[in-house]
Swiss-Prot record:
This is UPF0147 protein Msed_2034. It comes from the Archaea. HAMAP family: UPF0147. InterPro entries: Ta0600-like_sf, UPF0147. Belongs to the UPF0147 family.
Amino acid sequence: MATLYDNEAKIKQAIVLLQKVVNDTSVPRNIRRAASDAIRNLQDPSLSPAVRAANATAILDEISQDPNMPSQTRISIWNVVSILETIRD
């Protein structure tokens, strides 16, 4: 069973990767907005780590199909989703 510390470390890692997407001006605005929303969900202290990860994954999964997304951004989003999918309560 994953410890809370492990989950929080994974969430912090995901936030760092998403922050890079948000700060990249070559990424379309709607994708940056979705990444910001995912970060906000990940930082919500009222929810358990698994729920925060699931909420963020839902946002990122939806936006990952955008045809306007640059390839390197899509790969970053997939990496974040992979990290978040390992979070369990």
